[in-house]
Amino acid sequence: MKEIYADSKNISVGSFAYQRSDQVHALATNNLDFVVDPIIPRSDEINSEKVFEDDFVVMYREGHDLSKIKDVSVDDILDQKHLHVSNRRRGLHLIDTELEKIGYRREVALRCQHFLIAPTIIQSTDLVLMGTRSFANRNNLPFAETPLDIPSMEYFLIWHKNDEGDGGHIWMKDLIVRAFKHAQR
């Protein structure tokens, strides 16, 4: 936001959830300028650029039993109670889908709607969180590597092709891309 306001004090930025099925239309009608999502809509009307990729780790509090294990196994992870972060009431996470492929299931003891509360929950309970390495580092959460072959978490910046030549759109796109690169450090 600092960079945005340094160059343009009259700009307004919003961030909110949108139905995936409505994204292409919302981009085409300029109801949305950009979408950041792990799934690129199937449409010839949009362009995208990968802005984030990170591998999964298992996070826990200081002194947790997992911190005492040198090479954490799948069973070690699955023996734990998990925190699941999702804005949906039910449904699987990418991690759960990958676990099911190899015949495993984790015990989700608590679901919360946002990652903002996750560090406090992890630091004050015995729950573990499977999330990205950058999230663990940014929140100073101890973590272990996962022995699971889980695809990396990827997010894409998505925009409508009609906006390709717009100077303001190009400027904002470049700011967003730089912000994601900075966030992964």
What is each of the regions a protein language model found here?
Residues M1-K9, L92-R105:
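Ligand-binding cleft/hinge of the Venus flytrap
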Residues M1-S43, C112:
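Central regulatory/effector-binding core of bacterial HTH transcription factors
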Residues K2, I158-R185:
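Extended ligand-binding regions for polar small-molecule ligands
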Residues I11, L27-V36, F56, Y104, ...:
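Alpha-to-beta junction loops
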Residues Q19-R20, V36-P41, R61-E62, H114, ...:
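Beta->alpha turn/N-cap motifs
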Residues S43-H82, G167-I170:
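Flexible hinge/capping segments at coil-to-helix
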Residues D44-K50, D54-D55, L116-E164:
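Beta-alpha-beta core module
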Residues L66-S67, Q80-I102, G165-K173, A183:
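Secondary-structure junction motif
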